[in-house]
């Protein structure tokens, strides 16, 4: 695709961030070469950082007029993107969403715009490659890259370019974003899937690109991983309650984990109550052993433990949201 075709469009790149002082400047330097070819501006939408991120962002904005600083008093990412589009999106064709803690290829933004123009898609989503550094983080990365951890999700594993219902948000036509009302700010998690549902219902098309992808770094410790997936589960339940959109099969199976785990407490009455959770645990650990032996992956057993944490947390979050909803209605 010619450079003239790229510069015939304009893009607003939005980076929601909170306490990213160690990453934000390097990320801006990574994106800076793409700004002129794409006729783009980049917005750092800060949710009240206390680690120096705000000062760095303001300095970067004074050094380059294409870099903009925006306060995000609501703190969550969905609110950051909504405010950036509302206040700064006029005149831009595309919204490109960047995660402050991710890693991107040098030509990431160019490939997104190229695929949007080539396919006519209203949204272009990408696959995520999960990478870790510490022992537990590496194990979590292997879990999230495996079917045990992602259920075969194509935006986790990557696939040939195709039309999709959902994926990791990367690019969206601002006209389409505004037409469906942007992100629902009541969602602290799963706001991307909820927006994709509304896009699909409104007739907009989502393209999963195979021209580029991003690298994501998972939680490095067990407790933060649990609460992250607990939030994901709550978000998926909120989506169900709002749209009556049933979870897919790959999500339905983990839904049973929290009930059978709590049901195991009944083993003091009848030992059979522990059988379901035992079968689940054995299946997960067996998969981990297969990873260790069949794939020669030394992190296999620990990856299985990480996946079990993800299953349990996601299921617990889903059911907690349903129970809270019933209490609110009552």
From Swiss-Prot:
| EC number(s) from the headed UniProt entry | 2.4.-.-
Residue spans crossing the bilayer: 116-136, 260-280, 299-319
Superkingdom to which the source organism belongs = Bacteria
Compartments, record wording:
Cell membrane
Provide the Gene Ontology terms for cellular component. plasma membrane
According to UniProt, this protein's pathway is: Glycan metabolism; exopolysaccharide biosynthesis
Q: Does the keyword tRNA-binding apply?
A: no
Membrane is among the record's keywords = yes
- Its topology with respect to the membrane? Multi-pass membrane protein
- Indicate the enzyme's highest-level EC class: transferase
Q: Which InterPro entries match?
A: Glyco_trans_2-like, Nucleotide-diphossugar_trans
The molecular function GO annotations come to: glycosyltransferase activity
One GO term (biological process): polysaccharide biosynthetic process
Keywords attached to this Swiss-Prot or TrEMBL record, sorted alphabetically, are: Cell membrane, Exopolysaccharide synthesis, Glycosyltransferase, Membrane, Plasmid, Transferase, Transmembrane, Transmembrane helix
Annotated function: Glycosyltransferase required for the synthesis of succinoglycan (EPS I). Needed for the addition of the second sugar (glucose). Catalyzes the formation of a beta-1,3 linkage with the galactose lipid carrier.
Family statement drawn from the similarity comment of this UniProt entry: Belongs to the glycosyltransferase 2 family.
Its protein name is: Succinoglycan biosynthesis protein ExoA
Recorded name of the encoding gene? exoA
């Amino acid at each position: 695709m010619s450079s003239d075709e790229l510069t015939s469009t304009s893009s607003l790149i939005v980076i929601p961030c909170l306490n990213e002082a160690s990453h934000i400047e390097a990320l801006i330097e990574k994106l800076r070469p793409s700004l002129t070819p794409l006729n783009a501006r980049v917005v750092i939408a800060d949710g009240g950082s206390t680690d120096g991120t705000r000062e760095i962002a303001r300095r970067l904005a004074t050094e380059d007029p294409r870099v903009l600083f925006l306060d995000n008093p609501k703190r969550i990412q969905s609110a950051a993107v909504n405010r950036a589009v509302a206040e700064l999106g006029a005149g831009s064709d595309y919204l490109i969403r960047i995660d402050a803690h991710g890693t991107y290829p040098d030509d990431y933004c160019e490939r997104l715009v190229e695929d949007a123009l080539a396919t006519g898609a209203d949204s272009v989503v990408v696959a995520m490659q999960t990478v870790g550094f510490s022992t537990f983080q590496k194990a979590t990365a292997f879990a999230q890259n495996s079917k045990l951890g992602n259920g075969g999700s194509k935006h986790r594993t990557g696939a040939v370019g195709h039309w999709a219902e959902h994926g990791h948000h990367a690019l969206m036509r601002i006209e389409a974003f505004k037409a469906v009302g942007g992100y629902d700010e009541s969602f602290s998690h799963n706001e991307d899937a909820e927006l994709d549902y509304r896009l699909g219902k409104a007739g907009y098309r989502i393209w999963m690109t195979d021209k580029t992808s991003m690298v994501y770094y998972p939680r490095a410790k067990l407790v933060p991983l649990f609460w992250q997936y607990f939030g994901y589960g709550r978000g998926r339940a909120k989506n169900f309650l709002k749209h009556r959109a049933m979870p897919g099969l790959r999500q339905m199976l983990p839904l049973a984990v929290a009930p059978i785990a709590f049901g195991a407490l009944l083993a003091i009455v009848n030992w059979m109550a522990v059988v379901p959770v035992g079968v689940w645990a054995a299946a997960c650990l067996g998969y981990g052993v297969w990873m260790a032996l069949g794939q020669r992956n030394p992190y296999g057993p620990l990856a299985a433990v990480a996946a079990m944490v993800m299953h349990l947390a996601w299921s617990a979050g889903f059911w907690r949201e349903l129970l809270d909803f019933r209490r609110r209605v009552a």
